[in-house]
UniProtKB/Swiss-Prot annotation:
Protein's recorded name: Ubiquinone/menaquinone biosynthesis C-methyltransferase UbiE
Pathway annotation: Quinol/quinone metabolism; menaquinone biosynthesis; menaquinol from 1,4-dihydroxy-2-naphthoate: step 2/2; Cofactor biosynthesis; ubiquinone biosynthesis
Binding site for S-adenosyl-L-methionine: T74, D95, N123, A124
Catalysis performed (reactions): a 2-demethylmenaquinol + S-adenosyl-L-methionine = a menaquinol + S-adenosyl-L-homocysteine + H(+); a 2-methoxy-6-(all-trans-polyprenyl)benzene-1,4-diol + S-adenosyl-L-methionine = a 5-methoxy-2-methyl-3-(all-trans-polyprenyl)benzene-1,4-diol + S-adenosyl-L-homocysteine + H(+)
S-adenosyl-L-methionine among keywords: yes
Family statement drawn from the similarity comment of this UniProt entry: Belongs to the class I-like SAM-binding methyltransferase superfamily. MenG/UbiE family.
EC number: 2.1.1.163, 2.1.1.201
Pfam family name, one: Ubie_methyltran
A GO MF term: demethylmenaquinone methyltransferase activity
Organism of derivation: Shewanella halifaxensis (strain HAW-EB4)
Keyword Transferase: yes
Amino acid sequence: MSEDTSNSTHFGYKTIEAEKKADLVAGVFHSVAAKYDIMNDVMSFGIHRMWKRFTIESAGARPGMKVLDLAGGTGDLTAKFSRIIGDTGQVTLADINDSMLKVGREKLRDKGIVGNVNYVQANAEALPFPDNHFDIITIAFGLRNVTDKDAAIASMLRVLKPGGKLLVLEFSKPQHDIMRKVYDLYSFKVLPKMGSLITKDADSYEYLAESIRMHPDQDTLKQMMEDAGFEQVNYTNMTDGIVALHKGYKF
């Protein structure tokens, strides 16, 4: 069942009209785009690089494949996939936010990554790609910002080739009480202050902390993927479940 049937949704802890969420989320990422990479390193103490490395390893990309890096933002995963798939493959970096796409494009071009990457501004709920098109889809730290997650998961299934794999890297639920308490303290007391110091925008990082708490937990997201039609769905917790990587296949 789509989570948008009541015509309302969550923006952090606030309940809003569903059609307003995309614009509000866009405002958050327009605000933080220029400092996004710096904040990722600071607020995760660099651990996000380990989470992303595990995602790349789990994807099993090979030369010649077509990869969709959805909500790919500043292009961390795209850069790594580009090197793996080579000249015969293609990575599509897609994001709904044009500010994030601009930062990603400039960053990758500065690194000399140009030949096998294209950029598309796209809404995850209605992907503008043909059926059965991609070998691999990744969405890293993006699904929780989508208004209708069920629609997005169904759209990803549609554009995957049979045999293709979806990997969802996302903040999730810590598994132990002490970690939950430390994580809550950090998220709601420390993180907004970091956001204020580095990006001059505490409110956006308060939203990001709230959006993590409102995102489905590990087993709920697994069920959502299965309900959409993905098979062999499983997940791996990292850093005690602060982050989880979900994997599912289209057959």
